[in-house]
Amino acid sequence: MLTLLATLLTACGGGGSGNSDSSSTTSPTPIPTSTTNSTVELAAMKLLNENRSQCGFGSLTANQNLNLTAMNHASYMASVTETNKQPFASHEERVETGLLDTGITNPYYSGIDLAARLNPFTLGKNAVSTYYDYQAQGENISLSNFSTNNSSYTVNDTATVEAMLYNLFAAPYHLRSLVYPQFTEVGLSYQLVKWTANNEINHTSLLEIVSALPSSQKYIENTKLLNFPCDGVTTGYELTDETPNPFGTTRDLKYQPIGQPIYVLAPFDKTIAEATATITQNGTSIGMIHTLTSLSDPNKLLSKNEVIFIPDLPLKPNTGYQVSYQLVYNDGQKTTNQFTFKTRP
């Protein structure tokens, strides 16, 4: 029996302004395998909110229009996956060279990017109409593909979507977007596509998460020192892929995976001048930790009050860790925090 599991995390959007510009034979179009607020999506919502709330970032409220936005795009990616017999995930719904049924001709097309999909002008025949007026928005996508020659294999959707969410939390930029404290509402969609190629049966799972702050709510700046993980949280233990790569072109995460990152958000009016951290397991240091700040971030996504500590090596599964970090702000003020967390089996 041959089995293969692959995961992919696509580039995540951070906060976005509501004023920004947004600018052969095919297989049958797939029918979405789950509906909004299905058991699987509710499990993902529960896990997301438990982690946000426990670490002080606040829980999110489900929004039906965001659910529809997420469902449209998840269905688009599922359609492209099935038509081309290869896993596909992207933040954009544009024509892709070498792929069939991409762009505006796809029956689930709803907009070139997330900003357009929140208020779609052009819809494919199977896409649904939706509208969401936002101040800030973000998008996280996770893809998991399982290949096997076992025709009786079935996917445990709930376990799969939870593992996909843990993978997102283990990715520095995706983690940052998932816990963004100004987001108050969320929409999710999970799709499963089954297809066969080269005598292998593939099960492609797609998770689309759209988070936002509606225009009707006041934007409240963060005034706390927050971090994820935090006391009592269970996380992933390694990361083998993220786009964009937090190391730029200097490291291939597939061959040099990293451990669960530590994301720290200082109050909005603070600028982090120095940041140090130690991570130990039963008193023994785990080794090198990379420090990502607004100055060292190769993708220029972090703000002046953010830092991400990244273990150089994967952590151990089902293991407890102790974290201690210190920040020095540009006004000379120092702050520290300590907490423990555990990795999942």
Residue ranges and their predicted role:
Residues 263, 268-270, 317, 328-345:
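Extended, polar beta-sheet/loop recognition surfaces of beta-rich domains
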Residues 287-299:
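Solvent-exposed serine/threonine-rich low-complexity stretches and specific carbohydrate-binding patches
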Residues 15-281, 302, 306, 322-325:
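Functional surface patches built around histidine and acidic residues
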Residues 8-11:
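C-terminal motif of bacterial Sec signal peptides marking the signal peptidase cleavage site
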Residues 1-3:
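Sec-dependent signal peptide recognition
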Residues 312-319:
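Surface-exposed, short loops/turns at beta-strand junctions within beta-sandwich domains
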Residues 297-303, 316, 331-333:
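Short proline/glycine- and polar residue-rich coil/turn motifs
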